[in-house]
Regions:
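Conserved beta-strand elements of the Class I
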Residues: 83-86, 186
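Conserved S-adenosyl-L-methionine
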Residues: 80, 103-111
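Short helix-loop-beta connector
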Residues: 76-82, 179-181
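Histidine-anchored nucleotide/phosphate-binding helix
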Residues: 94-104
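Reductase modules of NAD(P)H-dependent flavoproteins
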Residues: 114, 119-189
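Ser/Thr-glycine-rich phosphate-binding loops at phosphate-binding pockets of nucleotides
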Residues: 88-93
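A short, basic/flexible loop-to-alpha-helix module at the beginning of a structural domain
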Residues: 68-78
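Ferredoxin-reductase
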Residues: 1-60, 146-147
Length: 190
């Protein structure tokens, strides 16, 4: 399956025998050169498809519909010295694909990955992702929590990304400035 880092694929399942499959777009989390496709999918409580996909067992099938789509790809970003990847929740997926990609690291050396989650447990995938990367390819990871009330469970920061940018707290935590001349910023999530 051919795709560029940052793109999404349309996955589907036939939920009732003989019915048309229900299809949704999910960002690909694996690198383009990986032998398998990986997705970070959050089961939406009353969702039509995501609970079914996340309940699949090994060996069960899912429909992969059509070619990969999407324009949140690093080849569309003009050069700069620092790339900021700002994600909320499963918006981490396209950035995981980029960070795992050989071609991505040929273009970017200084990367800041910011993940905003409700509770700190939701940051496990990001921490595992960064830890699995070679040392020379690890972005600066900043986790911010929005619904933790116990200070012992806060992330690196607490609050929503726009508020942290406006206050200067995000730049302080990253030890870098966001400037139009040198920074490029990608956003993904809700």
């Amino acid at each position: 399956y051919s795709f560029r880092a940052g793109q999404f694929a349309r996955l589907g399942m036939e939920l009732e025998p003989g019915a048309a499959p229900v299809i949704r777009g999910y960002s690909i989390a694996s690198a383009p050169e990986a032998p398998t496709l990986e997705f970070f999918i959050t089961a939406v409580k009353d969702g039509q498809l995501s609970p079914k996909i996340t309940a699949l067992e090994p060996g069960q099938s899912v429909l992969l519909d059509g070619p990969a789509e999407g324009s949140l790809t690093p080849d569309r970003i003009p050069g700069g010295s620092t790339l900021w990847l700002l994600a909320t929740g499963s918006g981490l997926s396209p950035f995981a694909s980029m960070l795992r990609s050989e071609a991505f690291w040929a273009a970017w050396k200084d990367v800041v990955l910011v993940l905003s989650v409700r509770q700190i447990e939701e940051a496990v995938l990001a921490r595992e992702l960064v830890a699995a990367l070679p040392l020379e390819r690890r972005p600066k990871l900043i986790v911010t929590t929005t619904r933790e009330t116990d200070p012992a469970r806060f992330g690196d920061l607490t609050g929503r990304i726009p508020t942290l940018i406006a206050s200067g707290a995000l730049e302080a935590a990253a030890e870098r400035q966001i400037t139009p001349e040198e920074s490029r910023v990608l956003l993904c999530g809700n």
